[in-house]
C-alpha cells in the first residue's frame, strides 16, 4: 500500500502524463488546412488527366499499328496545357529512353495524333527518369493478381510521384483502393517514400437501371486524410458521383469537381 506522502507525487505525475497525452492527441487530430486539401485535389485532377490521356493515346497508337507497343512503357507529360504520351523502353544500360511512338493531344481532349519515331528518338530527361521510376516502383509493388495502371507526375524538388492503382476491367465498375504512391528521386533510381494509400480494393457494383446514388462511401484506416486516388475515383466515374471518406477523426466529402470539404469532425 502507498503511504500518504508517496501517493501525492505519484498522483501529480499521473495527472501530468494525462495532460501530456491529451495534448499530444489533440495535435495529431488537428484538421488539415485548406492548402493541404487543395494540393490533394490538384494531384487527383492531374492523375485523372494522365490516366485519360494514356488511355486515349494507347487506343490511337494501337489503331495506327496494332501490337507495336506491347511490352513498352507509356509515359505522359503535360506541356502548355496539352498532354503528350510517348511509348518506348529503356536502353540496356538504363541511360536513355528510346521513344518509338508519340501521341499528341489535339483540340478535343480525347483525340490524339500519332507519330512513329523511325529514327528511334532517345530521351535523357523527364521520360528517362520517369521510365526508371516506373521500373523501380514495379519491382517494389506487391499487389493482387489483377491489372494495374501506373502514372508518373512531377513532385517537389524535381522528384517524381509514381502511382500504382487498380485498372478498371468492367463497364460501370470503378475500383478504389489497393494503391500505392511512391516518391522517387529526381533521377528515377531510388524510392524516397512509399505511401500505401488504401489497403484493400473495393469494387462497388453498378446501380440498377433508374436508380441514382447520392454519394459513395469508404473508410480510411491508414491516415486521417483523403488520398489523391479518392479524387481520381470521383473524377473517373461516368456520371460523376461524390464520395464520402471516413477516417478516424474526420468525415470528408470529395465533390464532383475534385474539391474536398470536411463534413464532420469526430472526437
Residue spans for each PLM region:
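A short, surface-exposed beta-strand/turn
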Residues: 97-114, 174-192
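Non-catalytic interface/targeting segments
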Residues: 139-149, 153-185
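A short, well-structured beta->alpha microelement
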Residues: 191-206
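Active-site-proximal loop/helix of nucleotide/amide-processing enzymes and allied scaffolds
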Residues: 27-116, 122-157, 202-267
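Charge-rich, low-complexity terminal tails
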Residues: 172, 176-180, 184-186, 192-196, ...
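Bacterial N-terminal signal peptides
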Residues: 12-22
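Bacterial N-terminal signal peptides that target proteins for export
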Residues: 2-14
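Non-cleavable N-terminal signal-anchor transmembrane helices
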Residues: 2, 18, 25-33
